[in-house]
């Protein structure tokens, strides 16, 4: 009897102990829940929240690389089309008239940023990338069927670059949401895609056109672009959730009321007036000076191969000593190279060396410019402000190549005036970048800006 009573007491004690443990667990859970309610929500815009690495962040970089390979990489090979159209497909038209195709591509690429940047802020990158993929591939397919100047102008000069703008802007903007300390390096890697595209596409078309003809060369290029853009659509995402807000004129004008943003924009506009002229005319100029066409066909790939390093190495250095410092130096470097090598070049060697050095110097412009804007912008408005920057650059991009064509016509097919203009206008742009850099960080050369 005593033994039975003892067992009952032990069981009762166990039940009480178990109940006490459950009560404590419930109390702890309630306290944790209360703490979680009281804890402030995570702010994705806080500098400490930027991953600056990890699989997800670097997969966005990989997708952005593919996107710029297909968008700006295509733009970087405009020189081979200028030469081909002048000598064959559109040989009945003047150099200045043909250059409007490339100018429209650049204009729409940059002007699209005015709309695409704001749409990105409101809805994110997904639908923009899908629309851009369709328009770019469709435009190239239509160009493969074109036989008249106006048809190529509509397909390659308008339809395709609408898609390119929708591919370029979201890729650049998304990088800024994943990286802060390594933003220059990440932007440089993404921008390197445009350099590699500028290497692959000219060589590919130089080989394909004689073998399968212009129409099928364009179709093969379009299929390659479609494959890479599928990867971009699957990987390019923003870390920051979209913020649907009404668009007002004040939002578009606000950035230009900031002194540093305005000075940076003016400097970039001036620099762009000369930036693309060597890319567009170096191949035609080399053939005019007696370079074998089979060798001249490799000038654009050489230029873009060098820009691969110009987009990555300066971006890495910019993270260490400041993007404005590096960007300004590279702009001066490009201008000096134009004066020192392109202007006096009259044989193969200096033209080839110029292509390599100018590719390295000018490659940093597109790679670091978004980093400059991100540095002086609220991350919540990164899409609008980068879009506004590139949108304004559409104006000098539109007139740049026709101005170069007018100089060529003035020199009766020569390129001296065009070369002098390139050196002078890029030097002026570089000087204005110095002014913008001083506006942000003062005159000290040792300060990281």
Swiss-Prot record:
Q: Which domain of life is it from?
A: Eukaryota
Provide this UniProt record's keywords sorted from A to Z.
Answer: Cell membrane, Glycoprotein, Membrane, Transmembrane, Transmembrane helix, Transport
UniProt cross-references to InterPro entries, sorted A to Z: MFS (IPR011701), MFS_dom (IPR020846), MFS_trans_sf (IPR036259), Proton-linked_MCT (IPR050327)
- Give the induction note: Expression is dramatically up-regulated (29-fold) during the naphthoquinone-producing stage (on potato dextrose agar) compared with the naphthoquinone-nonproducing stage (on complete medium agar).
Q: Name one GO cellular component term.
A: plasma membrane
**Record region (Disordered):** 1-43
Listed transmembrane segments: 61-81, 97-117, 127-147, 152-172, 185-205, 212-232, 262-282, 298-318, 326-346, 349-369, 390-410, 420-440
**Coiled coil (residue ranges):** none
Localization terms from the record? Cell membrane
Keyword ATP-binding annotated: no
**Chief place where the protein resides:** membrane
Protein family: Belongs to the major facilitator superfamily. Monocarboxylate porter (TC 2.A.1.13) family.
Question: What is this protein's function?
Answer: MFS-type transporter that mediates the secretion of the 4 major naphthoquinone derivatives produced, erythrostominone (NQ1), deoxyerythrostominone (NQ2), epierythrostominol (NQ4), and deoxyerythrostominol (NQ5), as well as of 3 newly identified naphthoquinone derivatives termed NQ7, NQ8 and NQ9.
Q: What name has this protein been given in UniProt?
A: MFS-type transporter 1
């Amino acid at each position: 009897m005593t033994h039975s009573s003892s067992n009952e007491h032990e069981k009762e004690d166990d039940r009480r102990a178990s109940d006490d443990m459950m009560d404590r667990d419930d109390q702890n859970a309630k306290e944790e829940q209360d703490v979680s309610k009281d804890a402030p929500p995570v702010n994705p815009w806080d500098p400490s929240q930027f991953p600056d690495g990890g699989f997800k962040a670097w997969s966005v970089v990989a997708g952005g690389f593919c996107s710029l390979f297909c968008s700006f990489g295509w733009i970087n090979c405009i020189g081979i089309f200028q030469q081909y159209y002048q000598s064959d497909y559109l040989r009945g038209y003047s150099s200045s008239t043909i250059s409007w195709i490339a100018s429209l591509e650049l204009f729409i690429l940059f002007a699209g940023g005015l709309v695409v940047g704001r749409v990105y802020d409101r809805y994110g990158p997904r639908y923009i990338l899908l629309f851009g993929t369709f328009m770019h591939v469709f435009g190239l397919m239509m160009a493969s069927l074109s036989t008249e100047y106006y048809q190529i102008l509509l397909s390659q000069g308008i339809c395709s670059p609408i898609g390119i703008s929708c591919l370029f802007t979201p890729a650049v903007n998304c990088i800024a949401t994943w990286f802060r300390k390594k933003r220059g390096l990440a932007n440089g890697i993404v921008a390197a895609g445009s350099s590699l595209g500028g290497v692959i596409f000219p060589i590919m078309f130089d080989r394909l056109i004689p073998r399968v003809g212009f129409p099928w060369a364009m179709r093969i290029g379009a299929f390659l672009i479609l494959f890479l853009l599928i990867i971009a659509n699957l990987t390019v995402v923003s870390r920051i959730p979209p913020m649907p807000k009404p668009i007002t004129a004040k939002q578009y004008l606000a950035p230009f009321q900031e002194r540093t943003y305005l000075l940076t924009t003016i400097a970039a506009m001036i620099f762009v007036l000369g930036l693309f002229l060597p890319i567009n005319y170096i191949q035609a100029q080399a053939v005019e000076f007696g370079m074998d066409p089979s060798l001249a066909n490799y000038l654009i790939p050489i230029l873009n191969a060098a820009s691969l390093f110009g987009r990555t190495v300066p971006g890495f250095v910019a993270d260490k000593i400041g993007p404005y410092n590096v960007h300004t130096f590279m702009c001066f470097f490009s201008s000096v190279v134009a004066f020192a090598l392109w202007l006096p070049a009259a044989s193969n060697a200096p033209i080839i060396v110029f292509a390599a050095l100018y590719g390295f110097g000018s490659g940093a412009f597109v790679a670091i410019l978004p980093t400059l804007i991100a540095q002086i912008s609220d991350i919540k408005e990164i899409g609008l402000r980068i879009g506004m920057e590139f949108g304004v650059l559409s104006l000098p991009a539109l007139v740049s190549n026709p101005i170069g064509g007018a100089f060529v016509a003035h020199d009766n097919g020569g390129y001296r005036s065009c070369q002098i203009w390139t050196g002078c206008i890029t030097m002026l742009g570089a000087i204005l970048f110095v002014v913008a850099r001083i506006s942000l960080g003062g005159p000290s050369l040792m300060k990281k800006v």
